[in-house]
């Protein structure tokens, strides 16, 4: 028999579960005025996110809906054949080609700001309006990977009156090309918060005139690799008497792992940390080029 399975899901709940509250100190919390826990949305009033592609350094925009897309194309083949003499042959095979995505919209620090701190909201006409009050910083982490998996098992067995022997082969293969792209931004603390705009500082580096800053400086990752495992096994199941049974076997495995990531070291052998604008091909302050290894 052959089975084809297609899946297409968009899981937004992880991006919408954050909420501000006041911690009382005795283990309980109070609601912030105007924000109902469990009933108010703390997701900013924008439907798109901007990010820097870790692989190319390109600036891209994607909707929150598309950023949570996970799709799978899976083919399964199952076969079993029996001979009259007790011999049986099984084949089980599965191939999966998938796109996996996971989107965080993680609240970070919350601070109270005054007008002198230079935060503004933007009106529908594009005009900036000075803002003071609580400011919530947030990290958007867009995780996405292309995955290919292959599983294959074939087994030949024969059953006698008091014993059964089996010989089989397992083959497992997994290939992944994964990256996480992170973007920082600030917003007001209220239901359906507004994005906040501010000037660059020594620690904050915006992308143009947008509210997004410090692209790929926090938690950005890249990994591309594969794993292959091949095994040969044999077993013998023997009922010596009605009370005694012996079951033994042997298994021989070959495993190979290979991959590259962005654990980059400079000429002195020290690790190079993330920085604003981090991506494959970027150059760190000490001149180290960011490249998979």
Question: Where does each model-flagged region fall?
Answer:
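Transmembrane beta-barrel strand/turn architecture of Gram-negative outer membrane proteins
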Residues: 1-21, 67-103, 141-182, 292-293
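Intrinsically disordered, low-complexity segments enriched in small/polar residues
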Residues: 2, 40, 49, 79, ...
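Structural signature of Gram-negative outer-membrane beta-barrels, strongest in the C-terminal barrel
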Residues: 2-5, 147-149, 159, 164-174, ...
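Acidic/polar loop-and-plug regions of large Gram-negative outer-membrane beta-barrel proteins
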Residues: 3-76, 101-142, 196-218
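Context-gated lysine
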Residues: 30, 59-61, 71, 80, ...
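C-terminal/domain-terminus segments
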Residues: 72, 96-110, 182-188, 192, ...
């Amino acid at each position: 028999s052959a089975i084809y399975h297609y899946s297409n899901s968009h899981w937004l709940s992880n991006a919408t579960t954050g909420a501000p509250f006041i911690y009382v100190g005795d283990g309980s919390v109070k609601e912030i005025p105007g924000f109902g826990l469990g009933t108010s949305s703390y997701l900013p009033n924008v439907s798109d996110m901007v990010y820097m592609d870790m692989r190319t350094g390109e600036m891209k925009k994607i909707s929150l809906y598309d950023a949570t897309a996970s799709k799978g194309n899976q083919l399964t083949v199952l076969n079993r054949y029996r001979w009259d003499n007790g011999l049986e042959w099984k084949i089980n095979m599965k191939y999966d080609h998938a796109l996996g995505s996971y989107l965080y919209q993680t609240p970070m620090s919350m601070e109270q700001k005054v007008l002198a701190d230079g935060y503004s909201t933007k009106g529908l006409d594009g005009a900036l309006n000075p803002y003071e009050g609580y400011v919530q910083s947030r990290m958007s982490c867009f995780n996405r990977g292309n995955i290919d998996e292959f599983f294959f098992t074939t087994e030949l067995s024969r059953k006698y009156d008091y014993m059964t022997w089996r010989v089989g082969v397992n083959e497992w293969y997994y290939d992944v090309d994964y990256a996480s792209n992170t973007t920082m931004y600030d917003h007001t603390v209220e239901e359906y918060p507004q994005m906040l705009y501010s000037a660059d500082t020594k620690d904050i580096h915006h992308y143009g005139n947008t509210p997004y800053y410090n692209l790929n400086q926090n938690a950005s990752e890249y990994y591309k690799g594969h794993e292959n495992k091949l095994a040969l096994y044999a077993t013998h199941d023997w009922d010596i008497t009605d009370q005694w049974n012996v079951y033994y076997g042997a298994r021989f495995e070959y495993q190979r792992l290979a991959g590259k990531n962005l654990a980059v070291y400079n000429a002195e052998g020290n690790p190079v940390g993330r920085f604003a604008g981090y991506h494959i091909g970027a150059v760190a302050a000490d001149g180290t080029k960011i490249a998979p290894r």
